Curated annotation (Swiss-Prot):
Claim: Cell wall biogenesis/degradation is one of the keywords in the record: no
Membrane disposition: Multi-pass membrane protein
Gene3D superfamilies for the chain: NADH:ubiquinone/plastoquinone oxidoreductase, chain 3
A GO cellular component entry from the record: plasma membrane
HAMAP family associated with the record: NDH1_NuoA (MF_01394)
EC top class named in words: translocase
Positions of region (Disordered): 160-183
Localization, UniProt: Cell inner membrane
Gene: nuoA
Protein name: NADH-quinone oxidoreductase subunit A
EC number(s) per entry: 7.1.1.-
Length: 183
């Protein structure tokens, strides 16, 4: 069994310090913080704005597919950058490997465009393929399911009021500003 080195003491001190910091941050708010309960405390809020409407707002899912493709092709760009910084060290073998990699990327990109994965709505893909929906079958058009008519659906609650930004009061959607008449 070897003696404890200064490096071991540093690790032990670090673990003790982190543990103390975690316990401190969890217990001090319990001791010093006020405890109040009520209906307003149970309400969800986003950045201090009073919520409006229900939680069942349909948001467009079109961007998720593009985001996934962005992440995939962004990672490939990272690999290309790593190869470009070490191109002299890897030689012809690395060059050949990267050419195969780039060709695979181009094939994947052509496949993505050919399958219509970047087309915004499935109905456009069905029209391009010449597929007509069957009468009586459920319409599974994801673009129609996730579409919302306007931004007003997001900011107007069911009673037709627009929530105030920070006060919690509700302002009428149709309220007009006082006008001054000149005679």
């Amino acid at each position: 069994m070897s003696a404890i080195t200064p490096y071991d003491w540093a690790i032990i001190a670090f673990v003790i310090g982190v543990t103390f910091l975690c316990v401190f941050m969890l217990t001090v708010p319990l001791l010093l913080g006020g405890k109040s309960w009520g209906r307003a405390k149970q309400e969800q809020f986003e950045s201090g704005v009073v919520s409006a409407g229900g939680a069942r707002i349909r948001l467009s899912a079109k961007f998720y597919l593009v985001a996934i493709f962005f992440v995939v092709f962004d990672l490939e760009a990272l690999y290309l950058y790593a190869w470009a910084t070490s191109v002299r060290e890897v030689g012809w073998m690395g060059f050949t490997t990267m050419v195969i990699f780039v060709v695979d990327l181009l094939i994947a990109l052509i496949y993505v465009f050919a399958t219509g994965a970047l087309t915004w709505s499935p109905s456009d893909r069905r029209k391009a393929a010449g597929i007509k929906p069957k009468i009586g079958s459920p319409n599974m058009n994801i673009a129609e399911i996730t579409r919302f008519n306007s931004i007003e659906e997001l900011v107007i609650d069911p009673t037709g009021h627009i929530p105030a930004q920070s006060s919690g009061r509700m302002k009428s959607k149709t309220s007009t500003a006082p006008s001054s008449k000149q005679e």
